[in-house]
Amino acid sequence: MKQYLQVTKPGIIFGNLISVIGGFLLASKGSLDVPLFILTMAGVSLVVASGCVFNNYIDRDIDCIMERTKNRALVKGLIAPGVSLWYATALGIAGIALLYFAANPLAALLAVLGFIVYVGVYSLYMKRHSVYGTLVGSLSGAAPPVIGYCAVSGQFDSGALILLAIFSLWQMPHSYAIAIFRFKDYQAANIPVLPVVKGIPVAKLHITLYILAFMVPTLMLFLGGYAGYKYLVVATAVSVWWLGMALSGYKAAVDDSLWARKLFMFSIVTITCLSVMMSVDFQPEAEPAVLVSMLP
């Protein structure tokens, strides 16, 4: 049974749940619906797990080439490919059904869209054929906090849009950092990530620009009245520090692999801090502009 847990990538599920909590509690504004919270977390976990299993199935031919993925269950034959497809399908159906019936149709729809982008667009095609695969994948990576938010609100409003911008822009430097310190793996597997296609100096520039872009929606969460001054202080501090770390990569004597690994680790600190602060420093009086509503 251990291999069936590992193939769902528990670390990725856990990381996504942190962002789900942030979005859910931000929308709750201090009024926590515990059953809805638990069921939303479970639903998102199942959908993310499904996407990860499908990704493992799709990537099994290149996972055997890459050092960090060569011991995955499907590569080593611990799970039959056909069984993994049934397993992934069951997880996905269960997760989407749970979000639909326990939360609302909008939360389920967002989960479906995120799943399609990750599995159908990114994993099946963009990852192997385009340098823009990371950009497309970032949209699916930003879905969980938006699902958490919309599970409460029942509508896609300006707050949900800001969350989508924050988490999708965060994904870019986070992912490029991985591609730099895992450069040889991606090169060996012929995956066209930016550092491999355009070079590490170009990737460093993109990382810096994306962090600058990321800082804008993080501030919008405060300026839009969704989060308070404590959030602002923490968000500003971690964003500026992250930017400083990115700029340190331009030093002549820098070890690119070590620098990228540190940048990657701090990206996790950054998004965790933001998720925690938007959970605890929400503004009850926030009145977002409604973009899409599925509530009667």
Curated annotation (Swiss-Prot):
Gene Ontology CC terms: plasma membrane
Reactions catalysed: heme b + (2E,6E)-farnesyl diphosphate + H2O = Fe(II)-heme o + diphosphate
Membrane topology note: Multi-pass membrane protein
Annotated localization: Cell inner membrane
Pfam families: UbiA
GO biological process: heme O biosynthetic process
Role played: Converts heme B (protoheme IX) to heme O by substitution of the vinyl group on carbon 2 of heme B porphyrin ring with a hydroxyethyl farnesyl side group.
Protein name listed in UniProt: Protoheme IX farnesyltransferase
Native species: Aeromonas hydrophila subsp. hydrophila (strain ATCC 7966 / DSM 30187 / BCRC 13018 / CCUG 14551 / JCM 1027 / KCTC 2358 / NCIMB 9240 / NCTC 8049)
